[in-house]
Amino acid sequence: MKNPLLRPWLTEKSTGLTEQKGQYVFQVKKDADKSDIKKAVEEKFNVDVVSIRTINCLGKTKRQYTRKGLIAGKKSDWKKAIVTLGEGQAIDYYAQPADKSDKQD
């Protein structure tokens, strides 16, 4: 797999996990497995990964009422990974240069 990491998932809850437990949350490709995610994080950020938990998130259903009636749709399903790093290690999301080659998918 080329690069399973899509983007860091920055929310209030994920920021709390980072500050309290040293866990970082990423949105990853749906077909990525834990070994691919571990390799990508270790290579990109030069850290040791202790554990990874993955979550398959279902896309929300959306409805819109129009003159022609109800239009129903669904957002895409996605996957996120919670990565725990070794003791004393950290990732600085903003210091990493943006890789333009990763955005081809």
UniProtKB/Swiss-Prot annotation:
Gene Ontology cellular-component terms listed: ribonucleoprotein complex; ribosome
InterPro entries in alphabetical order: Nucleotide-bd_a/b_plait_sf, Ribosomal_uL23-like, Ribosomal_uL23/eL15/eS24_sf
Keyword DNA repair: no
Record key words, sorted: Ribonucleoprotein, Ribosomal protein, RNA-binding, rRNA-binding
Gene Ontology BP annotations: translation
HAMAP family (alphabetical): Ribosomal_uL23_B
NCBIfam families: PRK05738.1-3 (NF004359), PRK05738.2-4 (NF004363)
Subunit relationships: Part of the 50S ribosomal subunit. Contacts protein L29, and trigger factor when it is bound to the ribosome.
Known function: One of the early assembly proteins it binds 23S rRNA. One of the proteins that surrounds the polypeptide exit tunnel on the outside of the ribosome. Forms the main docking site for trigger factor binding to the ribosome.
Homology family: Belongs to the universal ribosomal protein uL23 family.
Xref: PANTHER family: 60S RIBOSOMAL PROTEIN L23A
Protein name: Large ribosomal subunit protein uL23
Provenance organism: Chlorobaculum parvum (strain DSM 263 / NCIMB 8327) (Chlorobium vibrioforme subsp. thiosulfatophilum)
Gene name linked to the record: rplW
